[in-house]
A protein has these predicted regions:
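Conserved, well-ordered active-site substructure
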Residues: 55-59, 405-407, 415-464, 468
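Gly/Ser/Thr-rich loops at beta-strand to alpha-helix junctions
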Residues: 41, 45-49, 119-129, 156-158, ...
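C-terminal structural cap/anchor segments
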Residues: 350-414
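Cap/lid and interdomain-hinge subdomains that line or gate substrate/regulatory clefts
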Residues: 29-43, 53, 86-92, 96-115, ...
Length: 484
């Protein structure tokens, strides 16, 4: 972030158009209870549950698991696809298979639903691919014509806002356009503009012009309310992109009520969003952050060490683990990524790490495992994805090698936390307990997992302040022992 650049004040900007209405969320919930409409969230990494609680996430999209996930009265189900870590072909295949299974199961169960494609609040991920595939497959398998897809990257818990069609990150008290942050330089999903209409044109390689998008502005929301937003939604057809400006839950609650009204009128929508809209449109109320006792296993593993595993290579993550290591006595094990990427040295390096981790955990020593911080890049996106996958699979091997159950498990990074969940811990069905801190969800593993009934802290790579990992660690240690 350049010191010479003049940015909008975060505080001053958020105070403009500031409104609240605590009754809106209850109205959303009442509507869903009456209509029984469900939202099925296809989550491209496991961090998308970072605003919700008391809901379930499945990591297996077979028909039996989808049926189990839709069998209760909850209005939302998450399906972890992990497509952000896959190439375009695999991403397309996964989305098609899931839609086919959803269509079959919901037809059998008599459920009306909408699909949310939940992705990154910093605009990374397979857009427009996933939306286009969902539209095409719904038309083929269910004869559903999508009127439009709402683009809603707002994620308030991590200070991500969309104002005048520009998507911002709140950083150091200022609003910074997302294209001026490290996330825009992502080796796989990089982009050049934070102006969402122009971003659509950029990501579609010009096939969708910037002026073809419908806009729901803050003025529409605050001055026109539900009726004005509803009017805009009714004008959508043939999968029109619809950009939603939002800087508070009031804005999203108004949009959610208008969307539900439009659905009742026969409109069909897809959604490309970050995490905040799910909390709103599913009518989920606030709850306090989880206590340390809710984050730590309530069994004999309390006598074992906790385990933190870090794969994310963002600057934010590097700052966070440095802060943790400087503040608290925790065993530190660095995985040498160069050795992991070399077939001749990979096994020796992983054997070393696995032995140390198991010794530490069984001896009640909290342990941090992290990848070496030098980012290794290839010449193209496909090779960069392969590097990420190789590193992540190595972290999975560390988890799978554990012989004793840690008292808590935290994974840092989207790809890391997904692979740890599905391949390391063998999670198929988990309950989302809530959040440890803003934007950091906690799962409770199911009976099928490697370690059942274990709190699993899913920490996104792009979330939190410098001391956020240390803050969670401190909260756990204080509640467990009364001291650090």
């Amino acid at each position: 972030m350049s010191n010479a650049t003049q940015y909008l004040s975060l505080k001053d900007t958020l105070e403009l158009f500031s409104k609240s209405d605590d009754s809106l969320r209850a109205k959303i919930k009442a509507h869903l209870n009456q209509t029984k409409h469900k939202f099925i969230v296809l989550d491209d990494d496991p961090t998308g549950v970072q605003t919700v609680h008391d809901i379930f996430v499945i990591t297996d999209w077979g028909k039996d698991w989808i049926k189990k996930g839709l069998s209760d009265e909850r209005s939302v189900l998450y399906i972890l696809t992990n497509t952000r870590s896959h190439n375009a072909d695999k991403t397309e295949n996964i989305n098609r298979e899931i839609v086919q299974n959803i269509v079959d199961v919901t037809k059998e169960m008599g459920i009306n639903y909408s699909i949310i494609s939940r992705s990154d609040s910093t605009l990374r991920g397979h857009y427009p691919l996933e939306i286009n595939v969902l539209q095409d497959e719904l038309l083929k398998t269910a004869d559903v014509e999508i009127s439009g897809h709402l683009i809603i990257p707002a994620f308030f818990e991590a200070h991500r806002y969309t104002i005048d069609n520009i998507h911002y990150l709140g950083m150091e008290g200022q609003l910074v356009p997302v294209n001026e942050t490290e996330f825009a330089n992502d080796s796989v999903f990089g982009f050049k503009t934070a102006n969402l209409p122009k971003w659509i044109e950029e990501k579609t390689n010009g096939s969708v012009a910037s002026d073809s998008a419908l806009i729901i502005s803050l003025e529409d929301i605050h001055d026109g309310g539900i009726d004005r937003v509803y009017e805009i939604l009714l004008s959508a057809n043939n999968n029109t992109p619809i950009i939603v400006n939002a800087k508070s839950y009031y804005d999203l609650d108004i949009v959610s009520l208008a969307v539900l009204k439009a659905i009742d009128s026969g409109k069909q929508f897809l959604f490309r969003t970050a995490a905040s809209i799910v909390k709103s449109i599913a009518g989920i109320q606030d709850r306090p952050y989880l206590s340390a006792n809710e984050i730590v296993s309530n069994d004999e593993s309390q006598n074992n060490g906790g385990f933190i595993i870090v794969g994310s290579h963002t600057n934010k993550t590097t700052e966070q683990i440095k802060e943790l290591m400087s503040k608290y006595p925790i065993e530190q094990i660095e995985i040498n990524v160069v050795k992991v990427l070399n077939k001749e040295t990979r096994m020796e390096e992983l054997t070393r790490v696995c032995q140390l981790v198991d010794q530490n955990i069984s001896s009640n020593r909290d342990t941090l495992v992290y990848t070496s911080r030098d980012l290794i890049c290839a010449k193209d996106k496909e090779e960069n994805l392969k590097i990420s996958q190789t590193v992540s699979s190595s972290l999975v091997k560390v988890i799978r090698s554990l012989k004793v159950k840690p008292k808590f498990i935290m994974a840092k990074g989207g790809i890391t936390s997904s692979d740890v969940a599905t391949d390391g811990l063998d999670i198929k069905y988990a309950k989302v307990l809530g959040q440890a801190i803003a934007g950091v969800p906690v799962w409770l593993t199911g009976s099928e997992a490697k370690f059942k009934d274990t709190p699993y802290i899913v920490f996104p790579g792009n979330v939190g302040d410098k001391d956020s990992i240390a803050q969670i660690f401190e909260n756990i240690k204080k509640d467990q022992k009364g001291e650090i």
